[in-house]
Amino acid sequence: MNIILLGPPGAGKGTQAKKIAMRYGIPHISTGDMLREAVAAGTELGKKVKEIIEKGLLVPDDLMVAIVEDRLKKPDSAKGFILDGFPRTVQQAESLSGILGNLGKELDAVILIDAPEEVVVERISSRRVCPSCGKVYNLLTIKPKNDMLCDDCNIGLIQREDDKPATVRERYRVYMEKTAPVINYYSEHGSLITIDGSLDIEAVTEEIFKNLENL
């Protein structure tokens, strides 16, 4: 099954992608994770990505398309995939269509997990990360056992620059400006499924599986 997950940052795409991946035995391909790995590696590409992310801007289309194309060519994507965080522009959506055509694949579903700005800001600004092992916590839902310390490393947790409220609001603004047209693009192609992302995690999962089983 070939699936795209759309929605604003903080809507819960990553959480739901992992559940779908486990159920259908397909890889969860998160462009966000791939970009953060580049930043952590400290390469020239990573430095460029870091600067873009910290400003709350979108990574250029040509860079994202190249990253995704390479990933979809890997053997574990042969039976399907879940794309989380891509496409974010209509140009990326059109490029993806070309990539899939070349690989002999078609999209089965485009799932939009929608959530309002205030929900997004509250969720993301509550995230904390261990600078050593990279484990992610949330002060609302996945709290550390000891106040502001990693359960595994006992090191003080930090707030990533792109998780701070001002940056989150800018990311949401950019999302609405750039990604909303992608929703219209897939809506016109008849493959869009909209889910209320302000619901709790279990309710969102139930709605997603209900829709996928009816395809």
From Swiss-Prot:
<feature type="region of interest" description="NMP">
    <location>
        <begin position="30"/>
        <end position="59"/>
    </location>
</feature>
<keyword id="KW-0963">Cytoplasm</keyword>
<feature type="binding site">
    <location>
        <position position="92"/>
    </location>
    <ligand>
        <name>AMP</name>
    </ligand>
</feature>
<keyword id="KW-0808">Transferase</keyword>
<feature type="binding site">
    <location>
        <position position="160"/>
    </location>
    <ligand>
        <name>AMP</name>
    </ligand>
</feature>
<keyword id="KW-0418">Kinase</keyword>
<feature type="binding site">
    <location>
        <position position="150"/>
    </location>
    <ligand>
        <name>Zn(2+)</name>
    </ligand>
</feature>
<keyword id="KW-0547">Nucleotide-binding</keyword>
<comment type="similarity">
    <text>Belongs to the adenylate kinase family.</text>
</comment>
<feature type="binding site">
    <location>
        <begin position="85"/>
        <end position="88"/>
    </location>
    <ligand>
        <name>AMP</name>
    </ligand>
</feature>
<feature type="binding site">
    <location>
        <begin position="57"/>
        <end position="59"/>
    </location>
    <ligand>
        <name>AMP</name>
    </ligand>
</feature>
<feature type="binding site">
    <location>
        <position position="153"/>
    </location>
    <ligand>
        <name>Zn(2+)</name>
    </ligand>
</feature>
<keyword id="KW-0862">Zinc</keyword>
<dbReference type="GO" id="GO:0008270">
    <property type="term" value="F:zinc ion binding"/>
</dbReference>
<dbReference type="InterPro" id="IPR006259">
    <property type="entry name" value="Adenyl_kin_sub"/>
</dbReference>
<comment type="pathway">
    <text>Purine metabolism; AMP biosynthesis via salvage pathway; AMP from ADP: step 1/1.</text>
</comment>
<feature type="binding site">
    <location>
        <position position="31"/>
    </location>
    <ligand>
        <name>AMP</name>
    </ligand>
</feature>
<dbReference type="GO" id="GO:0005737">
    <property type="term" value="C:cytoplasm"/>
</dbReference>
<feature type="binding site">
    <location>
        <begin position="10"/>
        <end position="15"/>
    </location>
    <ligand>
        <name>ATP</name>
    </ligand>
</feature>
<dbReference type="InterPro" id="IPR033690">
    <property type="entry name" value="Adenylat_kinase_CS"/>
</dbReference>
<keyword id="KW-0067">ATP-binding</keyword>
<feature type="binding site">
    <location>
        <position position="36"/>
    </location>
    <ligand>
        <name>AMP</name>
    </ligand>
</feature>
<feature type="binding site">
    <location>
        <position position="133"/>
    </location>
    <ligand>
        <name>Zn(2+)</name>
    </ligand>
</feature>
<keyword id="KW-0479">Metal-binding</keyword>
<dbReference type="GO" id="GO:0044209">
    <property type="term" value="P:AMP salvage"/>
</dbReference>
<dbReference type="Pfam" id="PF00406">
    <property type="entry name" value="ADK"/>
</dbReference>
<dbReference type="GO" id="GO:0004017">
    <property type="term" value="F:adenylate kinase activity"/>
</dbReference>
<feature type="binding site">
    <location>
        <begin position="136"/>
        <end position="137"/>
    </location>
    <ligand>
        <name>ATP</name>
    </ligand>
</feature>
<feature type="region of interest" description="LID">
    <location>
        <begin position="126"/>
        <end position="163"/>
    </location>
</feature>
<dbReference type="InterPro" id="IPR000850">
    <property type="entry name" value="Adenylat/UMP-CMP_kin"/>
</dbReference>
<feature type="binding site">
    <location>
        <position position="127"/>
    </location>
    <ligand>
        <name>ATP</name>
    </ligand>
</feature>
<protein>
    <recommendedName>
        <fullName>Adenylate kinase</fullName>
        <ecNumber>2.7.4.3</ecNumber>
    </recommendedName>
</protein>
<keyword id="KW-0545">Nucleotide biosynthesis</keyword>
<feature type="binding site">
    <location>
        <position position="130"/>
    </location>
    <ligand>
        <name>Zn(2+)</name>
    </ligand>
</feature>
<feature type="binding site">
    <location>
        <position position="171"/>
    </location>
    <ligand>
        <name>AMP</name>
    </ligand>
</feature>
<dbReference type="InterPro" id="IPR027417">
    <property type="entry name" value="P-loop_NTPase"/>
</dbReference>
<dbReference type="InterPro" id="IPR007862">
    <property type="entry name" value="Adenylate_kinase_lid-dom"/>
</dbReference>
<comment type="function">
    <text>Catalyzes the reversible transfer of the terminal phosphate group between ATP and AMP. Plays an important role in cellular energy homeostasis and in adenine nucleotide metabolism.</text>
</comment>
<dbReference type="Pfam" id="PF05191">
    <property type="entry name" value="ADK_lid"/>
</dbReference>
<comment type="subunit">
    <text>Monomer.</text>
</comment>
<feature type="binding site">
    <location>
        <position position="199"/>
    </location>
    <ligand>
        <name>ATP</name>
    </ligand>
</feature>
<dbReference type="GO" id="GO:0005524">
    <property type="term" value="F:ATP binding"/>
</dbReference>
